[in-house]
């Protein structure tokens, strides 16, 4: 729709109504030193037709590279129906509605989403979503401190194998709240936390242990052993998981003897495209006994006065719009539109379809390993992987990535950017979107880049 600005008459009428002579008077209180000068670099106004031509010219400059980067954001096939349905007028909102019970369709969809997520994770309860995977982990840490009444230390063990961005965001959010994040090193041979390395913490007051599955290197952690160790210390277990991997892997609710206490992660692989970093959504599930400490909105099913099934926002006393000073979190909305897409995505795939996607991801990753072995490019860690793997290169990573990019292949993520001692390691992801020809192309371009 074309933008129709105010006329000069409109502007003068509005200024007269508020008792000022010109627009500049509205900004008198801002010191001149802080004001922005004339925007000389802004081009002259263009007509709608001229803007359309400009956008077509710029769009023609774009090209799509073959992408093998993962590191927390993954390229999956999204059925066309997902966003066609999600962007219908009935759904097209980022929020759960303010008059929630008047929007039964939206509430039912969120309820179905929560049901699907508890099924995937093996947990009892899911919320309606959080902002993203990183903030979901931070909220899980805060939640564990509230929920673990046996612990007074507020010490949370955070493995170095957790996504570096997640660790950074968590540090920022819990800063100043009396919570100590203790980094746990990983075994350089396996690329995962060795349960024996936790012996130094035995007998100490530990609030929670974070377990990424798979971890940032793509390696599967020994979740059962780590979970049992944490519970033996009266610590809670926070699982950080990839939802697609749960179609193949043991759900966190079944880890060890008792299962995880809180599960969170990034929901982007469930129907959200790679779009300059967002919008994504975070998910969180927990055991029923911890539900009153869970942040975010929760949709429940009930009966109305006439005995008909209905859906409501339940346990709202946890939320900041009810009792801000006692709320479990200051999150005041959620990623409802992306959750809508995720729900449709999971419904279209079904359990068998999601399992096929996960199996194809795993198969492609191992097929890529075989193609790279003759080049002297081998897995850096002995641990089993899901759909992402760290390779050790015979040459520095950054020049290799630059050379591959020039050939239209995004070769992976340089782990040296976040781990100074892993400068020769390249993190590569091959999802179900990669064909045999794509894998061959990757190996061909990698060979040329190493030459």
Swiss-Prot record:
Superkingdom per UniProt: Bacteria
Gene Ontology molecular-function annotations: glycine dehydrogenase (decarboxylating) activity
InterPro entries, alphabetized: GcvPA, GDC-P_N, GDC_P, PyrdxlP-dep_Trfase, PyrdxlP-dep_Trfase_major, PyrdxlP-dep_Trfase_small
The keyword Isomerase is annotated on this UniProt entry: no
Reactions it catalyzes: N(6)-[(R)-lipoyl]-L-lysyl-[glycine-cleavage complex H protein] + glycine + H(+) = N(6)-[(R)-S(8)-aminomethyldihydrolipoyl]-L-lysyl-[glycine-cleavage complex H protein] + CO2
Record-listed E.C. numbers: 1.4.4.2
Enzyme class, UniProt record, top EC level: oxidoreductase
Biological process (GO), any one: nucleoside metabolic process
SS bonds (residue pairs): none
Subunit structure: The glycine cleavage system is composed of four proteins: P, T, L and H. In this organism, the P 'protein' is a heterodimer of two subunits.
Protein name: Probable glycine dehydrogenase (decarboxylating) subunit 1
